[in-house]
């Protein structure tokens, strides 16, 4: 029972993390390639987030989880050498975001991701999911949040 519960929890986490990505076009995902060791990129991401005053509230090692559960879901290979996400928020920006439209809670937390594929070792892809909204007030604050996320990714890629 404990094993089944752990698998269900892992599946729900993956579904909640990656299914929204599948629902958006690739043009709404901003990525940059970094030719660097994954561990160096990881440290750069964590520093770039912290240097802007954000606090990571969850760090997910998605690649490890996918490898650990591969046989359980009928997979025989690995997509990633490493794949991780960092989730964080800003009380100031998030407050502005939900005050203009309460549904904008869907955009919190912010997520930066990094992965290195088995097929392209030595290149780490760093990025974030760009935000979009229907109303102008939401677009304005979401654009400000995207600017912060883009600056994190660009700093890591330098």
Q: What are these regions, as identified by a protein language model?
A:
Residues 18-20:
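N-terminal signal peptide c-region/cleavage motif recognized by signal peptidases
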Residues 1-10:
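Bacterial N-terminal signal peptides that target proteins for export
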Residues 115-122:
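A short, structured loop/turn motif at beta-sheet edges
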Residues 23-63:
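Terminal, regulation- and interaction-focused segments at domain boundaries
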Residues 34-42, 59, 76-79, 134-142, ...:
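Solvent-exposed, acidic/flexible segments
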Residues 52, 82-84, 108-110, 122-124:
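Envelope-exposed proteins and targeting segments
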Residues 126-158:
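C-terminal partner/receptor-binding element of secreted or periplasmic proteins
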Residues 61-66, 70-107:
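Compact, glycine-rich, soluble single-domain proteins
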């Amino acid at each position: 029972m404990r094993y089944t519960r752990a698998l269900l929890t892992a599946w729900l986490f993956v579904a909640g993390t990656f299914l929204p990505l599948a629902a958006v076009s690739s043009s709404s995902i901003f990525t940059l390639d970094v030719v660097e060791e994954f561990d160096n990129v990881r440290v750069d991401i964590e520093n770039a987030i912290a240097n802007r005053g954000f606090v990571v509230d969850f760090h997910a090692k998605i690649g490890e989880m996918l490898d650990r559960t591969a046989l359980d879901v009928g997979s025989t290979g690995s997509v990633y050498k490493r794949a991780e996400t960092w989730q964080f928020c800003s009380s100031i920006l998030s407050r502005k975001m939900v005050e203009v439209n309460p549904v904008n809670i869907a955009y919190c937390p912010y997520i930066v991701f990094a992965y290195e594929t088995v097929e392209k070792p030595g290149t780490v892809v760093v990025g974030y999911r760009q935000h979009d909204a229907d109303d102008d007030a939401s677009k304005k604050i979401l654009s400000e949040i995207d600017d912060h996320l883009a600056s994190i990714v660009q700093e890591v890629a330098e």
